[in-house]
Amino acid sequence: MHLKKIKFLSILCIAVFFQSCVTKPPESPDNICLIFKEKRSWYKAVMRAEKRWKIPPYVLMSFVYQESSFKSDARPERDKLLGFIPWFRPSTAVGYSQALTMTWDDYKDETGNSRANRKDFKDSADFIGWYASKGYYQGFERTDARSLYLAYHEGYGGFKKKTYRTKQWLVKVSDRVQARSTKYQQQYWGCAQDLKKKKFLFFG
């Protein structure tokens, strides 16, 4: 009995440890300036993605907000068998970007980032930038969060075929993504210079 209790406590401690390792969502998800002030590493990751893939910070962050609400372990809810029994998940999406396994593998192959983890914000930010950059060569505007999000969801082939037209719920979601991107953009313009200061990046 004593050994069973020790084993139980050990498992409990391990579970608590791993739970503590999960990065918590920002306290003020509606304000990009406060997000970057709280999450210094996120700011640097987004700046690297912008430099590499030319995706504006406010567009990228509007994607993350919509896809995962800034939760590192986000997954689609399980389907329900007979209406109440938890069943399989509808897709393989995981993490901040909700990237599908197959698309994530394509990203790793193309970029050489073989150790990329979908639950890592830096990797997820780079993934979103990588995927969005494909749209620039097809005539997408870098600030057109709505169209970029529709292509992100449907694939560029699906976007070209306008498959989203049969999904009014998706069109409404893409409108929300655009609205949030615009809101983040206005906020970002007011704090961009402060964010660039070294003391802001490494102290406080």
Question: What do the predicted segments below correspond to?
Answer:
Residues 10-11, 58:
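Residue-level detector of alpha-helix boundary/anchor positions
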Residues 202-204:
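Short, solvent-exposed mixed-charge patches
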Residues 1-9:
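Bacterial N-terminal signal peptides that target proteins for export
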Residues 18-20:
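C-terminal motif of bacterial Sec signal peptides marking the signal peptidase cleavage site
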Residues 13-16:
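Hydrophobic membrane-insertion alpha-helices, especially the h-region
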Residues 22-196:
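Catalytic glycan-binding domains that act on GlcNAc-containing polysaccharides
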